[in-house]
Amino acid sequence: DSSIKRLKYVRYADDFLIGVIGSLEDCKTVKEDIKNYLKEALKLELSDEKTLITNAQKPAKFLGFDIFIRRSNDLRKDINGKTIRSLGHVPVLYLNYETMRKKLFDYKAARIAVENGKEIWKSIVRTYMIDLDDLEIVSQFNAEIRGFYNYYSIANNSPAINSFYHIMSYSMYKTFARKYKSSVKKILFQYKKDGTFKVAYENSKGKTLYQSFYHDGFKRK
């Protein structure tokens, strides 16, 4: 029914996303109304370059996600008890590689190389961490990886975080290698126990304990 119009709105800080069930003209009207309200009531300017109208089947960027809809593959029972495929659409959240790349750059854990015309991510030493002790280094990497995963774990393609993890892992190995004037191969031989990278430390009672590097995967939550 084209007479039924619906609108969904979500905002985080100064970023907002509006979903409109309606026509392109409806979307243009909503955008113009928002622009006028911001200008007249709040004395703010809406950027036309950053405020886009996008078909819901195409990705819209919001808070590091690509958001779009696709046909549902879910099965359901009809009124006769027969299994049929749903004809509706479902929202999809995708973690894009641009988001991962930016975070790796923020952490100074990667650089970009171009090989055969293709962009390649390369892990690098985090030199500002070399003076930290082993436990502090592993704990810092763990906190950053867990924080990234916790935020993006709702993405439909959350296992893609493995690409982020791989770079972070080798950035940590290289940081240890630089700290001890060694090589990644020797560092892995020294610190890997039962297939997991671990560092030893003493607690307040003098007991030796081990802190493991994150290795729990990136299953969607």
Please provide the spans of the model-predicted regions:
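Non-catalytic terminal/accessory segments
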Residues: D1-K221
